[in-house]
Amino acid sequence: MVKPLALDETTLEAPEWRISDLPVPYEEAVKTMEARAAAIAEGTAPELVWLLEHPALYTAGTSADETDLLDPKRFPVFSTGRGGQYTYHGPGQRVAYVMLDLKRRKPDVRAYVQDLERWLIATLAEFNVTGETRPDRVGVWVKRPEKGLTAEDKIAAIGVRIRKWVTFHGVSLNVEPDLDHFSGIVPCGISQFGVTSLADLGHTATMADVDLALKKTFRDVFGRG
């Protein structure tokens, strides 16, 4: 079992879980995250895990290279303060925005990102999908031997921002998005590997199924959920 982040179970409330049924505009989501992260830092709001979908769009992280935006007119493009490069969000992709107080858990950015990866891998395992990490590539990957001995596709992306030791932004897991929508960018600046989804791998899963798996596995990784 994954060792949870160190925390004081007696004083830290379980995070609030929020699920948005309708697609949330990106700018609205960022404003909501920033406000909630500030409130968490001030001690006036509990931690939050927010599950949602966005309308089709591209976001550019702080390391984005403009040459990786191959089709800038295809979908709206938003510059964002999260780490990473270009990524796609849209219908059929579960986005989990995670707002946690690392001061009260463990003030270690690398450990936090690794725990996000472990959370995604544990969630995928609920659907009998083996997710893996790579030391030189953030995110979660699956091997595709039917495409070649060394073929791998990305199934989940990670991009975080931390302010006053409170996290926001988070992860995206491809459930059944239109994978062609990724062709307008070089996802995460990595051109030699593709993208996949649960549906592409032959696994039928609803968003409700994925949400249940995310919540079930959260506590094993983060220690409170």
UniProtKB/Swiss-Prot annotation:
Stated name of the protein: Octanoyltransferase
Pathway per the UniProt entry: Protein modification; protein lipoylation via endogenous pathway; protein N(6)-(lipoyl)lysine from octanoyl-[acyl-carrier-protein]: step 1/2
Site feature location: Lowers pKa of active site Cys: K154
Active site: C188 (acyl-thioester intermediate)
Keyword Transferase: yes
Catalytic reaction equation(s): octanoyl-[ACP] + L-lysyl-[protein] = N(6)-octanoyl-L-lysyl-[protein] + holo-[ACP] + H(+)
Domain BPL/LPL catalytic: 43-225
Function: Catalyzes the transfer of endogenously produced octanoic acid from octanoyl-acyl-carrier-protein onto the lipoyl domains of lipoate-dependent enzymes. Lipoyl-ACP can also act as a substrate although octanoyl-ACP is likely to be the physiological substrate.
Additional facts recorded: In the reaction, the free carboxyl group of octanoic acid is attached via an amide linkage to the epsilon-amino group of a specific lysine residue of lipoyl domains of lipoate-dependent enzymes.
HAMAP family: LipB
GO aspect biological process, one term: protein modification process
CDD domains: LipB (cd16444)
EC numbers, comma separated: 2.3.1.181
